[in-house]
From Swiss-Prot:
This is Translationally-controlled tumor protein. Belongs to the TCTP family. The keyword Membrane does not apply. Pfam families: TCTP. The lineage of its organism: Eukaryota, Metazoa, Chordata, Craniata, Vertebrata. InterPro entries: Mss4-like_sf, Mss4/transl-control_tumour, TCTP, Translation_control_tumour_CS, Translational_control_tumour_p. It comes from Bos taurus. Gene3D superfamilies: Metal Binding Protein, Guanine Nucleotide Exchange Factor, Chain A.
Amino acid sequence: MIIYRDLISHDEMFSDIYKIREVADGLCLEVEGKMVSRTEGNIDDSLIGGNASAEGPEGEGTESTVITGVDIVMNHHLQETSFTKEAYKKYIKDYMKSIKGKLEEQRPERVKPFMTGAAEQIKHILANFKNYQFFIGENMNPDGMVALLDYREDGVTPYMIFFKDGLEMEKC
């Protein structure tokens, strides 16, 4: 399994269990997820290692809740955040500088294609700004990558967009 981590915050963003494809001439990775529902808070008696008490009503004190969301977000503990268009422009400008700096250190051959492609991709993001939900890694580092969540034309299938050069891969 390959875990994709944010190059800046080192937060886990997604893994290779999803359908991943390169978009925007290899600048971004598009990761397709699905809507899932999970029950949380319900404790299975077999995990306790004892018998259920014969006293009192069954299940007293434990309430279960069903949480519905996008599997990528839930599995990797991504945190939703929000931006105005102006705030996103400021964030993305600083983020691009950070990634450019990392690329200059680690992969200088990627600097020019990244900066050229990123400018085009940012125009596309800003043109479709109202369609996106924004997610950051579990540690909520404001300097880290902000992943974009959108839905396919069917309105049901979620997908997320990540800047490929802002990710590091870790084999597990």
